[in-house]
From Swiss-Prot:
Protein name, entry field: Exonuclease V, mitochondrial
Enzyme Commission number: 3.1.-.-
Compartmental location: Mitochondrion
A Gene Ontology term for the protein's cellular component: nucleus
Organism of origin: Candida glabrata (strain ATCC 2001 / BCRC 20586 / JCM 3761 / NBRC 0622 / NRRL Y-65 / CBS 138)
Annotated cofactor note: Binds 1 [4Fe-4S] cluster.
Needed cofactors: Mg(2+); [4Fe-4S] cluster
Subunit structure: Monomer.
GO molecular function: 4 iron, 4 sulfur cluster binding; DNA binding; metal ion binding; single-stranded DNA 5'-3' DNA exonuclease activity
Keyword Hydrolase: yes
Function noted in UniProt: Single strand DNA specific 5' exonuclease involved in mitochondrial DNA replication and recombination. Releases dinucleotides as main products of catalysis. Has the capacity to slide across 5'double-stranded DNA or 5'RNA sequences and resumes cutting two nucleotides downstream of the double-stranded-to-single-stranded junction or RNA-to-DNA junction, respectively.
Binding site for [4Fe-4S] cluster: C92, C467, C470, C476
Keywords of this entry: 4Fe-4S, DNA-binding, Exonuclease, Hydrolase, Iron, Iron-sulfur, Magnesium, Metal-binding, Mitochondrion, Nuclease, Transit peptide
Length: 503
């Protein structure tokens, strides 16, 4: 008879083996990939937190400051967090801290892959899948695409711009980039509506991706129609009709998609609260990004700079061609850049030009002859550009599009629960600014070492709801000691009750 991997793991967790350090570091033969992952993860955390006399993980770490402990102060690219990283109590904060200090990614379970497929299917149902270079054989054979941070960010911003325009023409947009800034001194989110001055030295970038935006109108009419493909025409019409938005009853609702392995929402209150807070962060970010387009333009440029990107470096010409093929609404804007026309955005129009730029290349002509290119595309392949195509341009257009959203964003937020690609339940709730502020202060205090870890309350109910599903359940001194104390207290109370009964 052979032992299953899980049985081997249980044997190796026995005290007799745990107390033997050479054996502790060894891996049981034929261990599964998940088992090996757990051994490595727990060993990593033990090296950071230490163990008690029983070999279990300690639950506090002296001088803990996750942001400084885990991110390189000399590397600007690491000077940011994600919205999900601020949800420190979505499960148990102790597990969250252990996972951080393990420095390992989450194990890729089957349900995570299934969830990603659902998100991708929903995205593809709303937006035409982006054409990849390998999808056009003559493209990869003719020109070279660059995939560094600059060009990945430019493509992401270009995609977000076109998706926001799509929102005003179709009523839906998915996978929308947003970001905000957290003041590490005050533990508050940056809010341009307040008197606080945005100081990059005090603010940490927080990034997020909104699953779903929905635009509705009382009269059923949307500001744009499918004929508005040009970026310039679309933004011009939105500007001209913005005063009519309120009259037409336009509203934008922010939603998050959660995938489930079964048709029920998570029973843990902390998980439900975290999802709501996630949406509140997104709402705050969209409001902030749309308040002042000039300020948002600067925030976007700073976002790029802390990633180590030069916002004035011209894009690789082949990447510009790819953007035109994927999103032909940009062709007209590129012609304006070539001619040196203004965009009625002084911060961009008056920015100094430090590089020359051209798309003129025999390879590009040859390539465009083999595809159904935009009628204006050929013009772009002749001569130099008065203004190069840079990240500054995309920051300007994205700032303008964000500014269209702010007056329309609803107080009502929504969670969409999916199972097997089907939405089985929607939960709608109202934004709670006070709860968001409290959560942000708590999360910031955790990340910058201003408070101790706050594990889930040690109760039998929580043990069944949280601890039984935790990777650290057999190594957690917090829950073991807490339950032992509660059991001892229960025994003492029972003895007292018996003595009283016998009096």
């Amino acid at each position: 008879m052979t032992l299953r991997d899980v049985e081997k793991l249980r044997l190796w967790r026995l005290k007799i083996f745990r107390n033997q350090q050479p054996i502790l570091r060894a891996k049981p033969p034929h261990a599964s990939r998940k088992t090996q992952y757990l051994f490595q993860k727990i060993d990593n955390v033990k090296s950071q937190f230490g163990t008690d006399g029983k070999g279990d993980l300690l639950w506090q770490r002296d001088g803990m400051n996750p942001y400084h402990d885990l991110y390189d102060p000399g590397d600007l690219k690491t000077h940011r967090l994600s919205v999900t990283k601020l949800l420190t109590k979505s499960w148990c904060e102790l597990r969250f801290a252990y996972d951080l200090y393990s420095r390992l990614p989450l194990f890729r379970e089957a349900h995570l892959a299934a969830g990603e497929r659902t998100h991708q299917k929903l995205e593809n149902s709303e937006h035409t899948p982006v054409i990849r270079p390998q999808d056009i054989p003559q493209f990869s054979e003719t020109v070279e695409i660059v995939e560094d941070d600059l060009h990945v960010l430019a493509a992401s911003w270009a995609e977000t711009i076109t998706r926001l325009i799509h929102l005003f023409s179709s009523g839906d947009a998915r996978e929308i980039l947003c970001h905000g800034y957290l003041n590490k001194e005050t533990n508050q989110l940056y809010d341009p509506m307040e008197t606080e001055v945005w100081d990059p030295s005090q603010h940490i970038l927080i990034s997020g991706i909104i699953d779903h935006l929905t635009l509705t109108s009382k009269n059923g009419n949307l500001p744009l129609n499918n004929h508005h493909r040009s970026i310039d025409d679309s933004i011009a019409k939105l500007k001209n009709t913005r005063n009519e938005f309120a009259k037409n009853g336009l509203t934008i609702q922010i939603s998050d998609v959660k995938t489930r392995t079964r048709k029920f929402i998570p029973p843990q209150e902390s998980v439900q609260n975290a999802t709501k807070l996630q949406l509140m962060y997104y709402r705050h970010f969209l409001l902030s990004l749309g308040t002042d387009s000039d300020n948002t333009y600067e925030m976007l440029l700073y976002n790029a700079r802390i990633r180590g990107v030069d916002v004035d470096q011209p894009l690789n010409p082949a990447n510009c061609l790819l953007i035109m093929i994927q999103m032909d609404g940009f062709v007209g804007d590129f012609v304006k850049l070539q001619n040196g026309d203004g965009f009625q955005f002084p911060k961009f129009d008056n920015a100094p030009i430090s590089h020359s730029f051209t798309l003129a290349d025999a390879k590009h002509h040859q390539f465009l002859q083999n595809i159904n290119s935009h009628e204006l595309a050929g013009q772009l392949l002749n001569g130099t550009f008065a203004k190069p195509i840079t990240l500054r341009y995309f920051a300007m257009r994205l700032a303008q599009m964000y500014s269209m959203l702010t007056p329309l964003i609803s107080e009502k937020l929504k969670v969409e629960y999916y199972h097997n690609n089907e939405c089985f339940q929607e939960v709608e709730f109202v934004n709670d600014k006070k709860s968001l502020g409290e959560s942000c202060r708590s999360a910031s205090s955790f990340w910058f070492g201003k408070r101790a870890i706050e594990p889930v309350e040690a109760t039998t109910f929580n043990y069944n709801q949280y601890c039984k599903h935790c990777d650290y359940r057999d190594h957690c001194a917090w829950i073991k000691d807490s339950l032992a104390k509660s059991t001892k207290l229960g025994d003492e109370l029972t003895q007292i009750a018996r003595r009283i009964h016998n009096i």
